[in-house]
Design a protein with these regions (language model features):
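C-terminal regulatory/interaction regions
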Residues: 2, 270-412
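Active-site metal-binding motif and surrounding structural segment of the metallo-beta-lactamase
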Residues: 30, 53, 64-114
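Divalent metal-coordination and catalytic microenvironments
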Residues: 36, 49, 59, 73, ...
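N-terminal non-globular leader segments, chiefly Sec-dependent signal peptides
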Residues: 1-16
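Active-site neighborhood of phospho(di)ester-bond hydrolases with catalytic His/Asp-centered motifs
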Residues: 58-60, 80-90, 115-117, 195-198, ...
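Conserved beta-strand hairpin/beta-sheet module of binuclear metal-dependent hydrolase folds
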Residues: 24-77, 186-198
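Metallo-beta-lactamase
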Residues: 2, 55, 62-64, 120-176, 220-232, ...
Length: 412
C-alpha cells in the first residue's frame, strides 16, 4: 500500500484528525489508483488516465506546482497527452498545459486538446481584469503574497451540459454542474469505475460559502453529488485531498456531503420564507452534528455559517433585513457615539479584551472594532484590537476565518 492509500485509510478510520491535516497540504506523490490510472497529489490534484492513444489528464495543477504534476505524470507514463480536461477555471487547476505542449512539439506529437465547460473562458476574462483584487484576497486567505496570473491557457473546446470523449477505445464522460463554481465539470470513466470530482469534493465541508469570492451554488452542488452516487464508482479522485477507495465508501462520502448541503439550504430557505433577517438566520441554522463529525466534512476550509450566507445571497438581495443598514451612517460615526456613551474608546477596548479572555470572541471583535474606529490613532487600542483578532484566529477552525482574522492581527 502506497503513501496515498495509507493516508486515506488513516483518515477514513479516524487515525488522523482532519483538523490537523489540511486537504490542501499535498503529499507530493503519485499512485496508481485504478487500472492504468495515476492520481497525482499536489496542492490541486491531477489524474492521468492511460488509453491506447495517449493520456487524458483531469486537471493539470497550479501555476506554482505544475512542474511537480508534469514530473509525476511522466514518472507514470511516457505516452503523449491526448486531452486535458479542466474541472473548473480556478488557477490551482488550469496551469501546466504548456509543459505538455512544449514536449509535444519537441517530440513531433499532436498538441494536447483542452476541454472545459463553456463558462471557463468568461472566468478567465474576469480574472484578467481583477488581478489586484484576487491577489489581495488570496494573500489574506492563504497568508502568502502571490502575484495573480495575467495569462491563461484557454480551452480549445467547450461544452454546455454533457460531453463524451472517446480516446484509444476508452470512454470518458464529462458532466457540467454548478457547485463551488458555475463552470464545474466532473468526469466518470465507466470501464474503470473512476470518478473525478474536481472541487465538488475536497475532503472538508464544501467550499460553498467563501466570504471573499463569488456566488456558489449549494443546491445544484448537492444534486450533482447525488447523481454521482447513482453511478456507484469504486474510486473517487477529488480536487483536493486523497482518493477514496471502495464503492460503499465513495457512496457514503458523496451522499453525506449532499445531505449537509441540503440541510443548510432547506433550513435557510425556510427561515427566509418566514421573513427572518440574515443575522437571525445565521444563528438559527445548525449543521447536523453527525455530518460535521465525518472526517471528510470537518469545517477546516469553509464553514456552515458562511454557506448559510451564500444561500441567502442566492435567493435574496444584498440587504440583510436590518433597516439601519439600508442607508447606514459611517461606522466611525457610530463608533464615536457609542464610545462617548460608554466612557471613551479605551473603555470599549478594555471590555473587548475582557470578553475575549472569557471566551466571547464574537462580541469582543465587535467592541474592539468600535474602539479602533473611534480612536484610529491610538496605538494601545490598535494593539488590543490585534490581540482580540489573534485570539479569534486561534479559536477558528476554517482556513477562511483564520485568514481573515490573522489578516487583522498580523497583515501579510
Amino acid at each position: 500500500m502506497g503513501i496515498i492509500r495509507t493516508h486515506f485509510e488513516k483518515l477514513w478510520l479516524g487515525e488522523i484528525d482532519p483538523l490537523d491535516v489540511s486537504p490542501f497540504t499535498p503529499l507530493m506523490a503519485w499512485e496508481e489508483v485504478a487500472d492504468r490510472v495515476a492520481f497525482v497529489s499536489s496542492f490541486a490534484n491531477a489524474t492521468a488516465i492511460a488509453t491506447d492513444d495517449g493520456l487524458v489528464l483531469i486537471d493539470v495543477g497550479s501555476f506554482l506546482l505544475s512542474a511537480h504534476v508534469h514530473a509525476a505524470v511522466r514518472d507514470f507514463s511516457d505516452s503523449r497527452v491526448s486531452h486535458v480536461v479542466y474541472t473548473h477555471g480556478h488557477v490551482d487547476h488550469v496551469f501546466g498545459v504548456e509543459r505538455f505542449e512544449a514536449e509535444a512539439q519537441s517530440r513531433g506529437w499532436r498538441a494536447p486538446h483542452v476541454i472545459a465547460h463553456e463558462a471557463v473562458p468568461a472566468r478567465f476574462r474576469r480574472y484578467e481584469i481583477s488581478r489586484g483584487y484576487n491577489s489581495c484576497i488570496n494573500a489574506r486567505q492563504f497568508r502568502t503574497k502571490v502575484e495573480w496570473p495575467a495569462k491563461y491557457r484557454y480551452p480549445d473546446e467547450t461544452f454546455a451540459d454533457k460531453h463524451t470523449l472517446e480516446v484509444g477505445g476508452l470512454r470518458v464522460e464529462l458532466f457540467h454542474a454548478r457547485g463551488e463554481t458555475d463552470d464545474a465539470t466532473w468526469a466518470f470513466v465507466p470501464e474503470r469505475r473512476l470518478l473525478c470530482t474536481g472541487d465538488l469534493f475536497i475532503w472538508c465541508s464544501p467550499n460553498a460559502g467563501n466570504p471573499q469570492k463569488v456566488q456558489r451554488f449549494p443546491r445544484d452542488w448537492a444534486r450533482a453529488l447525488r447523481t454521482m452516487a447513482t453511478l456507484r464508482p469504486a474510486v473517487l479522485c477529488p480536487g483536493h485531498g486523497v482518493p477514496i477507495w471502495g464503492e460503499d465508501e465513495v457512496h457514503e462520502a458523496l451522499s453525506t456531503t449532499a445531505e449537509l448541503l441540503e440541510s443548510l439550504h432547506d433550513q435557510t430557505l425556510a427561515l427566509m420564507n418566514e421573513g427572518a433577517r440574515l443575522v437571525d438566520v445565521i444563528h438559527a441554522v445548525k449543521a447536523p452534528p453527525h455530518l460535521l463529525a465525518k472526517p471528510w466534512l470537518r469545517p477546516v476550509y469553509d464553514q456552515p455559517e458562511f454557506i448559510v450566507r451564500n444561500i441567502w445571497r442566492t435567493y435574496g438581495g444584498w440587504w440583510d433585513g436590518d433597516p439601519s443598514s439600508l442607508e447606514p451612517a459611517p461606522r466611525a460615526s457610530v463608533a464615536c457615539e457609542l464610545a462617548q456613551l460608554s466612557g471613551g474608546p479605551s473603555k470599549l477596548a478594555a471590555r473587548a479584551t475582557a470578553l475575549a479572555e472569557s471566551g466571547d470572541l464574537a462580541l469582543a471583535c465587535h467592541l474592539a472594532e468600535l474602539a479602533a474606529l473611534a480612536a484610529p490613532n491610538d496605538d494601545g487600542i490598535a494593539r488590543s484590537r490585534r490581540a482580540v483578532y489573534a485570539a479569534r484566529a486561534r479559536a477558528a477552525t476554517s482556513l477562511m476565518a483564520k485568514g481573515i482574522y490573522n489578516g487583522e492581527a498580523d497583515p501579510v
